């Protein structure tokens, strides 16, 4: 190992360091990292840093040292477009400029030691520039980024900040969050003056392969705020949106939804499909009395199979109500009164199934009753 660093003034550090034949060992064995070289230069009011290794290369140049670069990114992005995220005002923009480029190679050895389960594909690249006018442009491209069984394939991220706003567009060929799989995804986030717009589209385009459509178009508007005690809060509502699961189209609409100080309120969140409906109203609070009401009308239980990772053969139609009662209430937990027709599990008929729960105050417990009726025989 060779190292020679000197602080020349303020935040600037110059010098270089070289480490040969790095090998890391853990319970899974030996990880060959190889050589690492870092060089830091400063001149003409520009700081330059170069990182070289077999798993990644990076270059940085800026009118401030890299520690100031991180602070300035906040200044021209989230602090400007979403000021409610911060209690203090922070520092202003000082007409600095920056350029950053990172290119990944085969990083499996170093990631398996420092971040087990993480994978970043060879040739993944990040480029970021900030002009003296505070204009940001950034792009991340990757064939695949994964963590365990979750991954993004064909990822392309674009970020900029025109006219005091912040915009990000994240697209991918494939997004997998077990058990969900979405293809041709496109997520847009836009923020200005604490107002946030979210647009998300996906289309698996598998009708010809499976005979069923799975796609979605979701639209959400939100406003960030702080209450009188400076607690962070958010108010949001769905614009007319839709999602198609196994060719069943669901329309999504809502009035206002709000979360602040460990308390959530939902007004008129509705998921509707021909012949079935889910409505959610009310609230939930960690330290207050409140109740969230969920009403089901002829809900197709087979949709649950899409979210279990395996096909358990669940089927039937559910109608009734569920109440989620906040933990600080006298009767915390879930109250149910559901009637399920033509119910089945694992391919076996269960018939008409009734599920109910009530709170027994003296014993401080829930009593749950589950009865089914098959061809007039009750169990």
Residue map of PLM features:
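Interface amphipathic segments
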Residues: 1-379
């Amino acid at each position: 190992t060779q190292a020679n660093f000197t602080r020349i003034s303020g935040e600037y550090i110059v010098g270089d360091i070289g480490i040969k034949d790095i090998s890391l060992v853990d319970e899974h064995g030996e990880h060959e990292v190889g050589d690492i070289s870092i060089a830091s230069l400063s001149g003409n009011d520009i700081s330059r840093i170069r990182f070289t290794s077999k798993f990644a290369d990076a270059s940085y140049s800026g009118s401030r040292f890299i520690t100031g670069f991180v602070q300035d990114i906040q200044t021209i992005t989230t602090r400007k477009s979403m000021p409610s995220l911060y209690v203090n005002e922070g520092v202003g923009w000082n007409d600095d400029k920056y350029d950053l480029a990172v290119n990944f190679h085969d990083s499996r050895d170093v990631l398996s030691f420092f971040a087990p389960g993480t994978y970043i594909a060879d040739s993944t690249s990040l480029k970021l520039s900030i002009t003296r006018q505070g204009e940001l442009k950034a792009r991340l491209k990757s064939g695949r980024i994964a963590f365990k069984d979750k991954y993004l394939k064909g990822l392309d991220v674009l970020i900029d900040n025109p006219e005091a706003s912040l915009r990000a567009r994240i697209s991918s060929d494939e997004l997998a969050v077990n058990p969900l799989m979405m293809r041709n995804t496109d997520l847009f986030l836009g923020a200005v003056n604490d107002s946030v717009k979210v647009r998300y589209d996906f289309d698996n385009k598998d009708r010809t392969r499976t005979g069923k459509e799975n796609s979605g178009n979701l639209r959400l508007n939100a406003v960030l705020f702080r209450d009188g005690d400076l607690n962070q809060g958010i108010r949001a509502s769905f614009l007319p949106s839709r999602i198609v699961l196994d060719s069943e189209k669901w329309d999504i609409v809502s009035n206002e939804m709000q979360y602040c100080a460990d308390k959530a309120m939902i007004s008129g969140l509705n998921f509707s499909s021909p012949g079935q409906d889910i409505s959610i109203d009310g609230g939930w609070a960690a330290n207050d009395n409140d109740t969230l009401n969920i009403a089901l009308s002829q809900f197709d239980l087979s949709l649950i199979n899409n979210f279990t990772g395996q096909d358990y053969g669940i089927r039937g139609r559910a109608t009734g109500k569920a109440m989620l009662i906040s933990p600080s209430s006298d009767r915390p937990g879930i109250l149910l009164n559901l009637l399920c027709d033509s119910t089945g599990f694992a391919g076996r008929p269960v018939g008409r199934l009734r599920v109910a729960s009530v709170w027994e105050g003296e014993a401080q417990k829930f009593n749950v009753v589950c009865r089914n009726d098959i061809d007039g025989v009750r169990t």
